[in-house]
């Protein structure tokens, strides 16, 4: 399987639309292709890029990332999304996608390669440790409503 997979950036709207079903496996709250496309378009204005793994003309995995800069890490690539279609879990494809994103970070002369995963996702955490990533902190989130911001 691995030798038949090509990893390349999604550049066209047609390819973005074709990626929806795979992204929905990771982000089940995504309601439809149009909403997904609009969200990716907004994220692209902030530097978001989407790598796709193609096999036999179909997208079977995705890695979404963006270049960032902050006082903690300096210049770094942040991985927003990493997903491999369920039928290809444990095939090595996740490792290949993560490596492709890491290579982008190196090419962009980044000092760090960063991602988050849910505390409830033990298998993902084990995968990231095996890929050489280390847990360096916790990510805190507060959902905001309009009432809370006024």
Q: At which residue positions do the language-model features occur?
A:
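A conserved beta-turn-beta hairpin within the catalytic core of GNAT-like acetyltransferases
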Residues: 69-79, 89, 135-136
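Residue-level recognition of the GNAT/N-acetyltransferase active site
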Residues: 68, 85, 118
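Acetyl-CoA-dependent GNAT
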Residues: 2-74, 99, 143-145
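Short acidic/polar active-site loop segments enriched in Thr and Asp
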Residues: 49, 111, 134
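Conserved GNAT acetyl-CoA-binding A-motif
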Residues: 105-117
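Conserved acetyl-CoA-binding loop-helix of GNAT-fold acetyltransferases
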Residues: 84, 90-103, 130
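Conserved active-site alpha-helix within GNAT-family acetyltransferase domains
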Residues: 95, 119-138, 142
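Terminal substrate-recognition subdomain of acyl/acetyltransferases
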Residues: 2-3, 103, 134, 138-150
């Amino acid at each position: 399987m691995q030798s038949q997979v090509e990893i390349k950036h999604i550049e066209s709207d047609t390819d973005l639309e074709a990626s929806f079903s795979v992204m929905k496996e990771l982000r089940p709250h995504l309601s439809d292709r149009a909403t997904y496309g609009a969200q990716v378009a907004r994220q692209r204005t902030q530097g978001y890029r989407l790598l796709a793994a193609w096999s036999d003309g179909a997208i079977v995995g995705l890695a979404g990332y963006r270049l960032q800069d902050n006082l903690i890490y300096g210049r770094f690539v942040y991985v927003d999304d990493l997903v491999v279609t369920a039928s290809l879990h444990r095939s090595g494809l996740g490792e290949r996608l993560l490596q492709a994103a890491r290579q982008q970070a190196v090419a962009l002369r980044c000092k760090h390669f960063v991602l988050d995963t849910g505390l409830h996702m033990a298998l993902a955490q084990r995968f990231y440790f095996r890929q050489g990533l280390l847990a360096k902190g916790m990510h805190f989130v507060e959902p905001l409503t309009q009432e809370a911001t006024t």
